[in-house]
């Protein structure tokens, strides 16, 4: 009975059975000459605190559920169709953040973002007051019911 249950879980969630934390050694296998880290479709479940990425960070289609405090991305963040649920305050992204189809429910206060914010097709319920987006903000097909007070969008609002 238990074996059948375990087999079913492994078949339904193949990434859960073989996922692990990205460490400083395995990170080297995914960095290109420009400082970009591409983890798309890789079996990682978490990122280390204080990770510094000189270029772009791509965690699309991964089991990574949270962006740790102190994460510094020198380029943009791609997290489309990922398991990402939580972004910790203190994360810095110099470019845009594309979270289309991720599992994010709220965008925290204290995240530095230098470009657009795409939250399309997410279970997003709220945004922080006085959020400033230096590009477009997309909340298409989200269950968000109202926009926060003091919202500033320098681009278009979708």
Where in this protein do the model-derived segments appear?
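Hydrophobic anchor residues at the C-terminal helix/turn of individual leucine-rich repeat
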Residues: 28, 50-51, 70-71, 90-91, ...
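N-terminal capping/linker segments that flank leucine-rich repeat
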Residues: 2-49
């Amino acid at each position: 009975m238990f074996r059948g249950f375990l087999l079913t879980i492994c078949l339904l969630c193949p990434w859960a059975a073989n996922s692990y934390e990205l460490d400083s050694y395995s990170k080297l296998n995914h960095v290109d000459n420009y400082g970009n880290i591409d983890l798309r479709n890789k079996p990682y479940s978490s990122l280390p605190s204080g990770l510094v990425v000189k270029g772009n960070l791509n965690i699309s289609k991964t089991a990574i559920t949270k962006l740790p405090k102190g994460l510094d991305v020198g380029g943009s963040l791609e997290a489309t169709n990922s398991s990402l649920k939580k972004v910790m305050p203190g994360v810095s992204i110099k470019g845009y953040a594309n979270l289309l189809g991720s599992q994010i429910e709220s965008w925290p206060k204290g995240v530095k973002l230098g470009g657009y914010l795409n939250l399309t097709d997410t279970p997003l319920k709220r945004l922080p007051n006085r959020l400033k987006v230096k590009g477009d903000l997309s909340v298409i097909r989200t269950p968000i019911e109202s926009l926060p007070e003091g919202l500033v969008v320098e681009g278009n609002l979708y």
